[in-house]
Design a protein with these regions (language model features):
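N-terminal catalytic cores of NTP/NDP-binding nucleotidyl/phosphoryl-transfer enzymes
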Residues: 2-35
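Short, flexible loop segments at the rims of nucleotide/cofactor-binding pockets, characterized by
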Residues: 9-11, 47-50, 67-72
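Short, surface-exposed acidic-centric catalytic microdomains
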Residues: 20, 28-64
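Proline-aspartate-enriched helix->loop->beta-strand connector
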Residues: 81-91
Length: 99
């Protein structure tokens, strides 16, 4: 089974995110999306973010038909551990979706 991985804040979902997930689905059998915790977003982007809390963002991501698994991470070490655990064949980013 080929696993495609992407991660990000996904705070305010927009059509570009949906396109990212749709293309990710076309590239593999399973799509895993990891999203930052609220604490990580505040640390990285300031106290005014995220607009939507983690529970809301996870629920929105879980409702998208192109996504199989939604995970959360609080720091880079945790993210790297999850990537190692799931061993995706492809790490897919929004930069790749623009190409």
């Amino acid at each position: 089974m080929s696993i495609v991985w992407t991660n990000g804040t996904f705070d305010i979902l927009h059509p570009g995110h949906i396109q990212l997930f749709k293309v990710a689905r076309s590239l593999g059998d399973k799509v895993i999306v990891a999203t930052d915790t609220d604490e990580k977003i505040k640390k990285d982007k300031g106290d005014y973010k995220p607009f939507n809390d983690l529970c809301y963002r996870v629920a929105m991501l879980e409702a998208i038909k192109y996504i199989d698994v939604v995970l959360t991470f609080g720091d880079r070490k945790e993210l790297e551990g999850l990537i190692q655990l799931y061993s995706p064949c492809l790490l897919y980013t929004s930069d790749a979706a623009d190409e």
